[in-house]
Amino acid sequence: MHRKKVRQFIVTSSSRNQVNLLVEYLFNGFNPFEFIISSEDVELKKPNPLPYLKAIQLSGINKNNSIVFEDSNPGLISSLAANLPTIFVPSNIPIVLEKNIKLDCILDSLGDENNVANVIKGPKLKKSYVDYSFLSDYLVSFSNAKN
C-alpha cells in the first residue's frame, strides 16, 4: 500500500504508547501511518463513531474513498455508524457478530504471499492476499450497493 501511496491511519481504543510500541516492532522503526487516533484523542471511544469521524476530518478524505479494517464488534459498530466502507477481519474465530450488524466484506485474514486470505463474504481476491486491486474493487462494490 505504501508503494501505491495509499494513505493509512490507525483508529484504536488502545493507548498511543501501546500502538507506538507495536508499530515500532512490526515495521522496524518505519511508520507507514500518517496519524493515530488513540483512546487519549477522543472523549467517546468505540463503539461510538467519533474516533472514525475524527480520522476522516483530520485526513480530509471523502468517506466513500476510505476503507476501514476492523477486528472487533465495538470497532464495527463505530465504523458502520460513521457510514464508512468496512472490511471485517475478525481477531476471534468463530465469528460472533452482534445482532443488526450488516457487512458486505468479511475476511479471515489479510493474507500475504505465503498465507492465503479467505473471503467469507465480499468480492473475490485476485491474489492470495488483500492488495490494491481488491480494495479498489471493494470500494466500487460498496458504492454500487449504496446506490
Residue map of PLM features:
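Short, acidic loop-to-helix structural element flanking the phosphoryl-transfer center
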Residues: 1-10, 16, 20
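Asp-based, Mg2+/Mn2+-dependent phosphohydrolase catalytic module
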Residues: 15-147
